[in-house]
Amino acid sequence: EDGVIYYISNRCELVCADVEGFRDGENDGPYKDEKYTSKIDGDFIWVLDMLNEYGVFPHNLATCSPLVVGNLVFVETSNGVERDHIAIPNPRAPSFLAVNKKTGEMVWGSNAPEDRILHGQWSCATYGAAGGVPQVLFHGGDGWLYSFEPEDGELLWKFDLNPKDSKWELGGLGTRHNIISTAVTIGDIVYLAVWQ
């Protein structure tokens, strides 16, 4: 969009890059610290380091694809459990972010589900307008789907995708499932599969 691309790096960074790279002879900023600047190298416009700036601990890998709607970029941070699959290093770190697409600054964030993360959070945000109400859907690491007002992050609703008596057991032995797929909206209906 507008000659830029947004992606999540393997270092848990949300990156905005110039699709021309340095072929256009310009170092578009505000990020100007590229190590390599030849015509075959990438030109980063801004970089949001979710690991160091917000304390996100991506379990396995930060994996979502950013969603751009209007002036905002929505991402799920992949905040999750440690290698032992039990402790959550930073349950207060944001799980969901809305970022200004021009500056890379966080507009709003949510740390839901905090200490209820089962494993990790790897899905991609979804945008829809159920009942004519614009909303962005985030897939919580607790098996809940969260709906937020896109501009200010007000929680509109949330829904547990598991039976109330379900139990989480690592290794797929339990009846509680986390969310790995991405929701699809058609009209006022949201479709989403869960599994462990």
Regions picked out by a protein language model, each given a short descriptive name:
Residues 1-196:
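Noncatalytic, solvent-exposed loop/strand surfaces
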